[in-house]
Amino acid sequence: MACDFLMVQRYENIVLAKVMKERLLDATSITSLGEALVAECDRTAKISLVIDVSEVGYLSSSMIGKLVAVHKAAKLGKGRVAIAGLKPTLLQMFKITQLDKLFEFMPEAEQAIMTYRRKPL
């Protein structure tokens, strides 16, 4: 399923996936985004996936579940996932559920890309 609100840029094994939707609530959007992100993990061995959510204002619990599935897919390929641009209220949700220990969080996508370039897998 294609995801028309996801822009993907590749820099060798670093993949920037920018989510261009403010609210991730409906099942169709969540499914298509989750499938597109997992496909990137499957396509790129030792992926360093940066998910830029700077335009996202709300994540449903289902979307958080999809992000966990994306993390698992990346780990299967010996990769890693950073979430960039997460708003403080959304970051708090990850902390409450202790999922902040699962992901790397970066203030901006550019910082995540630079960090991953300095520390390749």
PLM regions and their residue ranges:
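Residue-level detector of intrinsically disordered, flexible termini
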Residues: 1, 72, 83, 108-111
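STAS-typified acidic loop motif
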Residues: 3-35
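Short regulatory "switch" loops immediately downstream of catalytic or recognition motifs
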Residues: 17, 40, 117-118
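Conserved catalytic submotifs in the C-terminal HATPase_c
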Residues: 20, 54, 110
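Amphipathic alpha-helical interaction surfaces in cytosolic regulatory modules
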Residues: 23-103
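A charged, well-structured terminal subsegment
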Residues: 104-121
